[in-house]
């Protein structure tokens, strides 16, 4: 164990550092050809045509773990696979934050599950708003550092690229935060939309900053949202703690199988092509939206979506909905009283969206 490891484990709740968790029938490596240790049925269900569903699944399937580690550029022991990034967020908050004592810092407007998990844990929530200026939204790094130090935050969530605003945080700024908060907080960088970004992943920084945690998902670029496969990438000792806090069998066998197929060389080639097409469509859609008279502002985006301010966001939302086009209403979020978030679709879908918005302009006031 290296000299840095205690620093990471010291950030975990004291009673969980040596917590053994639940020892399931699959958590112990055993060999044999007659398995009678888990009270599973000896016969498959009639609906199980391949007779593969009667056994409990591997808690952390080695093949999928290796594939994800190769995809993200880390070691398999640095990966915890969970039910989407949502489970990773929840595990981190529960493992690190003492209720009513250890704060969680977020940067609104931002993905809501960080705050939800903090509230479920009864952890104080510290909010450092993003700054909206001529260049777009961006993180207020000095304010984040000051607030984290003053509040003694144990978890700092940074969404990059950020949902719903689309802004990515430069690596140098993230490294500044990591350097300043070493030993006092876990810095969690959510890269759910990383495949669409020009900013490189922060995963290589894990070698120098063991208090860095990275969240990744197969839901966005890899088009496997229903499979619910997310990854927590972190120091191996922290991953081991999180695994002990996780449910015994979190990953259904069909989901694991689909994820492995989705990470084959052929599938990754298709994914890369689609990401390139989405990035190109994102810029086409952004330019076209900016020309509409009812649009106040289209923010630059490093994700697969655009945040758009409208003169009349309600009219735009209702017109789109009436035409069968569903977008995300962001008007209840801080600083976004006039904004909608538009996912970048296929070229045909984007053209249809634009046609509806152009029709609004054509209607006399």
Curated annotation (Swiss-Prot):
Belongs to the class-II pyridoxal-phosphate-dependent aminotransferase family. Histidinol-phosphate aminotransferase subfamily. Homodimer. InterPro entries: Aminotransferase_I/II_large, HisP_aminotrans, PyrdxlP-dep_Trfase, PyrdxlP-dep_Trfase_major, PyrdxlP-dep_Trfase_small. One of its GO terms (molecular function) is histidinol-phosphate transaminase activity. HAMAP family: HisC_aminotrans_2. This is Histidinol-phosphate aminotransferase. Its cofactor is pyridoxal 5'-phosphate. It catalyses: L-histidinol phosphate + 2-oxoglutarate = 3-(imidazol-4-yl)-2-oxopropyl phosphate + L-glutamate. It comes from the Bacteria. The lineage of its organism: Bacteria, Pseudomonadati, Pseudomonadota, Gammaproteobacteria, Lysobacterales. It comes from Xylella fastidiosa (strain M12). NCBIfam families: hisC (TIGR01141). Pfam families: Aminotran_1_2 (PF00155). Keywords: Amino-acid biosynthesis, Aminotransferase, Histidine biosynthesis, Pyridoxal phosphate, Transferase. It is an enzyme of class 2 (transferase). The gene is hisC. Gene3D superfamilies: Aspartate Aminotransferase, domain 1 (3.90.1150.10), Type I PLP-dependent aspartate aminotransferase-like (Major domain) (3.40.640.10). GO terms for biological process: L-histidine biosynthetic process. Pathway: Amino-acid biosynthesis; L-histidine biosynthesis; L-histidine from 5-phospho-alpha-D-ribose 1-diphosphate: step 7/9. The keyword Zinc does not apply. The modification N6-(pyridoxal phosphate)lysine is found at residue 220. Its EC number is 2.6.1.9.
């Amino acid at each position: 164990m290296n000299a840095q490891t205690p620093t990471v484990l010291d950030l975990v709740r004291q009673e969980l550092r040596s917590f053994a968790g639940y020892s399931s029938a699959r958590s112990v490596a055993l060999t044999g050809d007659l398995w009678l240790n888990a009270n599973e049925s000896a016969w498959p269900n009639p609906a199980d045509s391949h007779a593969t569903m009667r056994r409990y699944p591997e808690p952390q399937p080695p093949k999928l773990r290796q594939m994800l580690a190769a995809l993200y550029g880390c070691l398999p022991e640095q990966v915890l696979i969970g039910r989407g990034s949502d489970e990773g967020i929840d595990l981190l908050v529960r493992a690190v934050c003492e209720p009513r004592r250890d704060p969680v810092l977020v940067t609104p407007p931002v993905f809501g599950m960080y705050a939800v998990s903090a509230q479920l844990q009864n952890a104080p929530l510290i909010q450092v708003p993003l700054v909206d200026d001529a260049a777009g939204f961006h993180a207020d790094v000095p304010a984040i550092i000051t607030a984290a130090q003053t509040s003694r935050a144990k978890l700092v969530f940074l969404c990059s690229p950020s949902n719903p605003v689309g802004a990515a945080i430069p690596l140098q700024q993230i490294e500044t935060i990591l350097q300043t908060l070493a030993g006092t907080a876990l810095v969690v960088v959510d890269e759910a939309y990383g495949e669409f970004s020009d900013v490189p992943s922060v995963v290589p920084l894990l070698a120098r900053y063991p208090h860095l945690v990275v969240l990744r998902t197969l839901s966005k670029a890899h088009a496997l949202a229903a499979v619910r496969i997310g990854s927590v990438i972190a120091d191996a000792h922290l991953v081991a703690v999180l695994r002990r806090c996780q449910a015994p069998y979190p990953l259904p066998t069909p989901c694991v199988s689909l994820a492995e197929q989705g990470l084959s060389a052929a599938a990754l080639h298709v994914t890369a092509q689609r990401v390139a097409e989405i990035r190109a469509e994102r810029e086409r859609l952004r330019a076209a939206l900016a020309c509409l008279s009812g649009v106040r502002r289209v923010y630059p985006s490093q994700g697969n979506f655009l945040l758009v301010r409208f003169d009349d966001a309600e009219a735009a939302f209702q017109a789109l909905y009436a035409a069968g086009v569903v977008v995300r209403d962001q008007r209840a979020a801080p600083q976004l009283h006039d904004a909608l978030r538009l996912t970048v679709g296929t070229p045909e879908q984007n053209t249809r969206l634009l046609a509806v918005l152009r029709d609004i302009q054509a209607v006399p006031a």
